[in-house]
């Protein structure tokens, strides 16, 4: 497990660890939720395939043959080993922040090898194994179907799971989740005895509640300790199965926010980068939630260069948040006693980020300064990105304005030919011509009458010219016909003379006879 990251553990065994705790719980202890295991800050996208993981786990781990029992014990041992590693990564490294990193890794691996075998003894009892097989049989009967996990399906699972839990004998909560301070010290001494280390401060409380417990006994704190209430097992189980619905709802909400917010609101500071809340009634600490800066930026800005710059800024925010996690836990896990007068007060819940009113010796100033440095660097980086984006937008507007007025080269204008622009230019030209005609100087009325008469005469002349041309065309045709008739008349006259001569000749011959 050395060198294995927090997200890698979540990908491989977090779902199996959670479900194993649900189905193999021997004394009815409350099911540790993902918030208790410390996975609150991990992205919601890792829970997309929770239903598929649950089905595969039930199918492979129920134990149809004889070899499954040994496999089950080996898997239990591996899961418990990973559980101890999770606790060590969260708490042991925080409590020993004064030591170097190499020594911390050696302690974590040594603690894992020694304690892993002792975490499994309640699971291997015969009665618990029989109860586990019954639970697995009921669970597999529910989840071997191919139906998708919907709201109605989730309600049915909740009802059946409640009936199954009611049939079992109710037992008390595990002292690990309700342990007071002296019980925590006992567990701490036992773990220290296994490993030979005596400075483990927060490893005894595996829940997320314990990671924020401060041993300070200052009476100036505003929160009072209350006993932990019972955690709803059904809600913890069904919340994992409804991961897909929650992820889709979150994506819809993000898209809706991106559509409503404008470009100016994105560049402004809309909300703090990290949000924290504390519910005093239920005593559940909500981790800091990272605002989805990258999603909003990439939805609004379409330029490739701008997108790369914004992704770099978002990655910077994520890296800063990851680097500050250990420092925050170090501030909250301070083991030095308070200097106030009240030494018998119960442990109080300390956020590690609020200012202390009493003279408590902790590393809150270190956390505050670290958060301030992260905030200032992030603000400066975001300011530079905002200025660059605004400059690019201004340049784009100037270029479009110059193209509209024709101040850019013809190549750019030819590339963006627009019919609307052509119609606008033609309309403006016609309006200019009409305006020039309307700007002629005024003349007297008699001159206007004369000009009107002249215009009428011009029209008549044009009509007469048309008529004359028509008549000339007609005359030319008639002239041609007349010439043809005259030629025929001459031919007929010649023929008449010839006939007359012939008649005279015949008469003369007749007279001679």
Curated annotation (Swiss-Prot):
Residues 359-381 have a biased composition (Polar residues). One of its GO terms (biological process) is nodulation. The keyword Coiled coil applies. It is found in: Nucleus. Residues 447-513 form a coiled coil. GO terms for molecular function: sequence-specific DNA binding. Residues 334-347 have a biased composition (Low complexity). PANTHER family: PROTEIN CYCLOPS (PTHR36890:SF1). This is Protein CYCLOPS. Belongs to the CYCLOPS family. The lineage of its organism: Eukaryota, Viridiplantae, Streptophyta, Embryophyta, Tracheophyta. Disruption phenotype: No visible phenotype under normal growth conditions, but roots of mutant plants are impaired in the interaction with rhizobia, specifically in infection thread (IT) formation in symbiotic roots. Residues 384-396 have a biased composition (Basic and acidic residues). Residues 327-435 are annotated as: Disordered. GO terms for cellular component: nucleus. Involved symbiotic signaling. Required for root infection by symbiotic rhizobia, infection thread (IT) formation, and nodule development. Required for symbiosome formation (i.e. the release of the bacteria from the ITs) and subsequent symbiosome development. Involved in arbuscular mycorrhizal (AM) symbiosis. InterPro entries: CYCLOPS. A motif (Nuclear localization signal) lies at residues 397-401, 421-424.
């Amino acid at each position: 497990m050395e060198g294995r990251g927090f997200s890698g553990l979540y990908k491989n065994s977090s779902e199996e660890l959670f479900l194993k705790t649900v189905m193999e719980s021997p004394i009815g202890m409350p099911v540790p939720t993902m918030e208790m295991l410390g996975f609150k800050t991990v992205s919601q996208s890792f829970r997309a395939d929770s239903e598929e993981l649950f089905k595969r786990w039930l199918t492979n781990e129920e134990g149809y043959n004889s070899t499954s029992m040994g496999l089950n014990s080996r898997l239990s041992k591996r899961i418990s080993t990973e559980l101890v590693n999770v606790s060590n990564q969260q708490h042991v490294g925080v409590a020993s922040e004064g030591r170097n990193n190499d020594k911390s890794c050696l302690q974590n691996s040594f603690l894992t090898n020694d304690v892993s075998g002792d975490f499994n003894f309640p699971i291997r009892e015969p009665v618990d194994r029989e109860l586990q097989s019954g639970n697995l049989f009921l669970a597999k009967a529910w989840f071997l179907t191919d139906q998708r996990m919907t709201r109605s399906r989730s309600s049915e699972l909740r009802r059946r799971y409640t009936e199954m839990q009611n049939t079992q004998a109710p037992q008390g909560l595990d002292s690990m989740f309700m342990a007071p301070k002296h019980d925590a010290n006992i567990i701490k001494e036992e773990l220290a005895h296994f490993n030979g280390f005596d400075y483990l401060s927060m490893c005894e409380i595996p829940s997320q509640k314990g990671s924020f417990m401060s041993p300070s006994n200052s009476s100036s704190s505003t929160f009072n300790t209350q006993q932990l209430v019972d955690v709803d097992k059904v809600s913890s189980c069904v919340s994992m199965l409804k991961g897909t619905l929650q992820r889709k709802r979150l994506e819809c909400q993000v898209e809706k926010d991106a559509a409503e917010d404008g470009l100016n609101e994105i560049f402004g500071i809309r909300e703090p980068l990290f949000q924290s809340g504390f519910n005093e009634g239920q005593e559940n600490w909500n981790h800091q939630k990272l605002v989805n800066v990258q999603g909003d930026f990439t939805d609004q800005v379409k330029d490739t260069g701008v997108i790369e710059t914004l992704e770099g800024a978002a990655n910077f925010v994520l890296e800063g948040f990851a680097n500050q996690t250990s420092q925050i836990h170090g501030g909250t896990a301070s083991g030095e006693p308070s200097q106030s007068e009240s030494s018998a007060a119960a442990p109080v819940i300390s956020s590690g980020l609020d200012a202390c009113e009493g003279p408590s010796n902790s590393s809150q100033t270190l956390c505050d300064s670290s958060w301030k440095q992260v905030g200032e660097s992030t603000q400066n980086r975001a300011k530079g990105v905002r200025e660059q984006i605004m400059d690019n937008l201004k340049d784009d507007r100037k270029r479009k304005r110059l193209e509209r007025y024709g101040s850019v080269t013809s190549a750019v204008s030819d590339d963006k030919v627009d019919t609307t622009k052509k119609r606008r230019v033609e309309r403006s030209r016609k309006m200019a011509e009409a305006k020039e005609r309307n700007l002629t100087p005024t003349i007297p009325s008699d001159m206007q009458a004369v000009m009107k008469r002249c215009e009428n005469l011009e029209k008549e002349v044009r009509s007469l010219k048309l008529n004359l041309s028509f008549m000339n065309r007609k005359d030319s045709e008639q002239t041609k016909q007349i010439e043809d008739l005259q030629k025929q008349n001459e031919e007929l006259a010649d023929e008449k003379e010839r006939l007359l001569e012939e008649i005279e000749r015949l008469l003369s011959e007749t007279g001679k006879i």
